[in-house]
C-alpha cells in the first residue's frame, strides 16, 4: 500500500483514490454529475463506493438555490388558488399545491400520499392550472397514467375543475401512434393512458419529452423487475408525481420501486437494499438470541 510524506507526515493513499483523482484532473479538475448525486453530496449522503471523498460542492443558478434549500430553512412559495380553477382548495390542499410547485421547479419527484378522499386529484389539477398562469422555466405536456377503471373519473374532474386544460385519452384499439400521436400531444395539455399501454406503446410514448409523468394508484409499479414498472421508469420527464393508493404492504422494496420512479438512482439499487435489510435482520436475530 502506498505511503507518501506530506509536510513531514506520512499519509496512506488507497489505490482507488489515486486513480479517481487522476481521472478527475485529466478531465480538467472539474466534473459534472446528475442532480440527484449533487443532492446526496449537499446533504452529506455521498456514495461510499467512491474511492475519493468530496471535500466541497460549488453550484450556481437554480441548482445553488435548490441545494441551499436543503438546509432546513426553506419556505414554500407563496401561491394563491389559481385563477379559473373551478373549485375551492382547502388549506391543506393549498399547501400541497405549493409543495408540488416547489419540487416541480427543480425537477424533484413528488409522492403525494394523502389519505383517500382528501383530494389528491384536485391538487394535481390545481398545479396544472397554476402552471398555465405562471409557467415554469420548462413546460410541456403531462402524461397521466391511471388504472383503466378511473380514466373517466380523471377526464370528468379535469373538465370540472380546469375546463381550459385540453385532454386526450390514449386508449382503445384505434388509438394513434407515432407521428399521429406526437401531433395530438402537441395540441393537448394532458394525455391520459393506462399502465398496460405504457409498456405496449413504450416506443411511441418514449418519443416525447414529457414535462410531467404522474401515476395514480402508483402501487401498480411496486414490483421493480416487471416490464410494466421498467417501461414507466424509462419515460423521459422533467417532473414525476406518484399517488400511492394504499399503504405499503409487506415489502420495503415496494416503496423503493415508487421512490426509484420519482427520482431515478437517488436511492441505492434494490439488490443493495435487500442485502442491507437481510444483514440487519440477521444482526437483530443474533442479538435477540
Regions found by a protein language model. Name each.
Residues 1-66, 255:
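Charged, low-complexity intrinsically disordered regions
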Residues 55-285:
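ASCE P-loop NTPase motor core, strongest for the SF2 helicase catalytic module
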Amino acid at each position: 500500500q502506498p505511503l507518501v510524506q506530506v509536510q513531514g507526515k506520512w499519509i496512506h493513499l488507497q489505490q482507488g483514490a489515486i486513480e479517481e483523482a487522476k481521472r478527475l484532473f485529466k478531465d480538467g479538475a472539474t466534473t459534472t454529475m446528475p442532480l440527484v448525486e449533487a443532492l446526496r453530496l449537499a446533504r452529506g449522503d455521498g456514495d461510499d463506493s467512491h474511492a475519493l471523498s468530496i471535500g466541497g460542492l460549488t453550484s450556481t443558478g437554480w441548482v445553488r438555490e435548490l441545494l441551499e434549500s436543503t438546509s432546513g430553512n426553506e419556505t414554500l412559495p407563496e401561491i394563491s388558488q389559481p385563477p379559473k380553477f373551478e373549485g375551492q382548495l382547502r388549506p391543506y390542499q393549498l399547501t400541497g399545491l405549493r409543495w408540488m410547485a416547489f419540487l416541480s421547479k427543480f425537477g424533484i419527484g413528488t409522492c403525494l400520499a394523502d389519505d383517500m378522499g382528501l383530494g389528491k386529484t384536485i391538487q394535481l389539477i390545481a398545479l396544472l392550472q397554476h402552471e398555465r398562469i405562471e409557467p415554469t422555466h420548462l413546460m410541456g405536456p403531462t402524461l397521466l397514467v391511471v388504472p383503466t377503471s378511473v380514466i373517466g373519473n380523471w377526464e370528468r374532474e379535469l373538465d370540472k375543475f380546469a375546463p381550459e386544460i385540453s385532454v386526450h385519452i390514449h386508449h382503445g384499439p384505434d388509438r394513434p401512434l407515432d407521428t399521429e400521436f406526437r401531433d395530438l400531444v402537441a395540441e393537448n395539455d394532458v394525455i391520459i393512458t393506462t399502465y398496460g399501454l405504457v409498456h405496449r406503446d413504450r416506443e411511441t410514448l418514449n418519443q416525447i419529452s414529457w414535462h410531467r409523468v404522474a401515476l395514480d394508484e402508483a402501487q401498480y409499479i411496486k414490483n421493480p423487475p416487471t416490464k410494466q414498472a421498467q417501461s414507466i421508469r424509462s419515460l423521459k420527464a422533467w417532473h414525476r408525481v406518484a399517488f400511492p393508493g394504499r399503504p405499503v404492504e409487506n415489502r420495503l422494496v415496494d416503496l423503493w420501486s415508487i421512490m426509484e420512479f420519482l427520482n431515478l438512482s437517488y436511492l441505492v439499487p434494490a439488490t443493495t437494499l435487500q442485502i442491507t435489510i437481510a444483514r440487519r435482520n440477521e444482526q437483530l436475530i443474533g442479538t435477540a438470541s
